[in-house]
Amino acid sequence: MNPPGSLEALDPNVDEHLSTQILAPSVHSDNSQERIQARRLRIAARLEARRREALGEYLDGKKESEEDQSKSYKQKEESRLKLAKLLLCGTELVTNIQVAIDIREIHRRVEEEEIKRQRIEKLENEVKTSQDKFDEITSKWEEGKQKRIPQELWEMLNTQQLHCAGLLEDKNKLISELQQELKTKDDQYVKDLKKQSDDICLLLERMEEQVKNVMKTFREELYNIEKAFEVERQELLASNKKKWEQALQAHNAKELEYLNNRMKKVEDYEKQLNRQRIWDCEEYNMIKIKLEQDVQILEQQLQQRKAIYQLNQEKLEYNLQVLKKRDEESTVIKSQQKRKINRLHDILNNLRSKYAKQIKQFQEENQSLTSDYKRLVMQFKELQKAMRHFALIDDEKFWEIWLMNEEEAKDLIARAFDVDRIIHTHHLGLPWAAPDFWFLNNVGPISQQPQKSATQIVEEMLMRSEEEEAEEAAAEPESYLDLPKQISEKTTKRILMLLCDESGFLIESKLLSLLLPLEQNECYLLRLDAIFSALGIESEDDLYKLVNFFLKYRAHRLSSSLQIKPCSQASMEKASMEETSTRSELELAEQTEMEGEKEESLVEGEKEEEEETPPSPWVIHPNDVLKILEAFVMGLKKPRDSRAPLRVQKNVRDNSKDSEYWQALTTVIPSSKQNLWDALYTALEKYHLVLTQRAKLLLENSSLEQQNTELQALLQQYLNSKINSELQVPPTQVLRVPTK
């Protein structure tokens, strides 16, 4: 009944799959934490593959075609799936103990390695220090041999004795620490043995319980399958008998119907053949007449084309003469331009000389400014270094002063709590419970709250949207996230849903197949988590940057679309101004055609502007999502990849709650309890006065009792004396003897 597989023997397919991932941790890494993470990932992948195989799922996301299945088959499949799930859950329940033990052992080994490393470092440091002390003592002996004065020798011997005693004390201290560590290891070993025995007992109990559950479930499912087969057998017998009778009746009816239809079709086909012959003859005559008319029309068009050709030839000759005159005019203009070019060359040479002088002057100024810049940069770096140094010192001093004051305040609070406890339990006879304030558990300055991840923000948003779906009919303002520009949560949700729908290629096919049976919000949450991990979005700020980037892109596109219309009109007017005014008939015709097209395009553009409605500023086209993501990822990688210059990076601490914290420490004992203490103090003073008076009276009473006993003893001695019997009137007859 041992669970199949262990931590060391893993599936080779899972190992190869994990090794192909570039960013995944490796089991061959030098970092122990990375090796532990790699083993955990391989175990999780292997267990997931076994679970899918047991449940009948396929890794490629394909499902078998659903056919008409009988009740017995459905019952068998349900029983198989139920038993597979039961076995899988039982195996996981049993193997969870081994996994927990393995993880605990891994943590213990890591801690043991760290302790061993620290112990080795400590021993090495001790060896170095003891060797230095021994060398110092040895060198002092050489110096002592050179001294001749007894006083100096005596002082030197005392110092050497002190050094030797210190060296031996360090060694004894180290030996005691190692012995104490060995003792703790023995105790830990006994505890581990006890824990292992408890785990084995728990494992056996779970295995016995799973065996009983599996046997019981197998019997129930076997009974259900037998019952389903019996019901299906009765239904099949009844249905097959009924189908056979219906099939015989339908066959006889179809044979009669087929004979009647065949006779009708033969008659219809004969009539259709006669009608088709008549229609074909009429159509042939009509086509012949039409073709003769087309021949006559084509002959007339040929004569018209010949006349147009003659007219175009005369126009071309006229245009040739016009071009020759223009060529003569262009030669005159070329000569004028050459003279102008020569004059401009002279001006260019003068400007080049001035430009060279300016470049030389600017280079000298640049060198001087560069030297000043380097000097200022060095001063700035030194200033930054000093600022970092003083900032660290200030933080350390602030931390020490805070801890000192906090410790002193908490000591006073503890003394006050002890006094309050004694008053309640001893004097008032009331039960006392220690107050639980939030500031008593705080140690050190109050820090800021940790930033949420992008996945947590999306999860909170989806949960909030589910709660607000029932209240959408009410006219309430939209809730806002903590965004820089107060973007509504509804807009953020739309953008994330669009991103989830259009970025499915960033999600693995295995994950998509697993998301099919989940609910909509859970599916969206897992898809967005995978997309965020692929895009490198980790923190809350990255999510807000993504939403702002989408909205800025949409606003930029709207502004550019509004600028296209005036630009297009200006370009068309400029093109019309640049057209050359020619007197030829062809150019005039082309110009008129272009103006007509321009007017038509303007009219159509005005109609389209009137017909189109302005798009919503929050609507983003799905085709633009990939472009926006590409631009966002490129912009997100640049600040992360580029190394910013060294600067003073100091976390600004939020000190808004410091006064509240120290004020809360001073008000641990409320005013009502202080009034109770004052009243109790006055009552105790009165009680103390009464007790002192009572003590004085008790002392006086004890002294009087002692005197009374002494007097009684003297009186008894006097009465018992022999002289009383000799008297004529004894005092016993006169005096009344007191009885005890």
From Swiss-Prot:
Residue runs in coiled coils: 101-388, 691-724
Q: Which UniProt keywords apply?
A: Cell projection, Ciliopathy, Cilium, Coiled coil, Cytoplasm, Cytoskeleton, Disease variant, Flagellum, Primary ciliary dyskinesia
Region named Disordered:
570-617
Q: Which GO terms describe its cellular component?
A: axonemal dynein complex; axoneme; cytosol; extracellular region; sperm flagellum
What InterPro entries does the annotation carry?
A: DRC1/2_N (IPR039505), DRC1/DRC2 (IPR039750), DRC1_C (IPR029440)
Where composition is biased (Basic and acidic residues), the residues are: 575-586
The answer on whether this UniProt entry bears the keyword Cytoplasm reads: yes
Q: Which family does it belong to?
A: Belongs to the DRC1 family.
Subunit structure comment from the entry: Component of the nexin-dynein regulatory complex (N-DRC). Interacts with CCDC65/DRC2, DRC3, GAS8/DRC4 and TCTE1/DRC5.
- Name listed for the protein in its UniProt record: Dynein regulatory complex protein 1
Q: Which organism is it from?
A: Homo sapiens (Human)
